[in-house]
Amino acid sequence: MFANAITFLTGISRVSHDYAAASHRRAVMVLLLFALACFLPGFFTLQPMDRDEPRFAQASKQMLETRDFVRIRFQDTARNNKPAGIYWLQSASVSVGQSLGLEDARRTVWLYRLPSLTGALAAVLLTYWAALAFVARGPAVLAAMLLASTILLGVEAHLAKTDAVLLATIVAAMGAFARMYLQSGQSQAEAALPGWRLPLVF
């Protein structure tokens, strides 16, 4: 039975891969659907699984309550060992939930997880983009699907922490650096004029 399930999933993956390799639009659509299928189960229902997740969520909650978006605090203790950006993203996510009328938004843990889910999805799409610097569309889709199917990224997508968003920024920098590196090896006749987009992404 297990072997049949593996065979079925392999067949689905192969069909999705072949369909996605036809165009960039299809690739992005398939990767998003595949990644959501990997990340969404349990996203809204799981209780905090990591000891740090409640600390991140509580610090972001206090940030909203005090309206102090500079000094990060967990209860009465300063929490300056993590980038402030993740707290801003979590606070923004909860604020959007409040504006949409979500009941008890500040105590709804999955709202604090939305930046991590978004970061994980971005990491998958950026892996596809980064791989296109080296390989054709088909292998690039496969690389992104492999990342989406990893257990660790699936776990991080469910946690209100920094790692999924950090991964997305790292993959973006790697993709930009790869393109700049490949351009540096071209002759002057082949190389395009240096633009501002890749350095900005890096």
Predicted segments, located by residue:
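Membrane-integral, polyisoprenol-dependent glycosyltransferases
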Residues: F2-F202
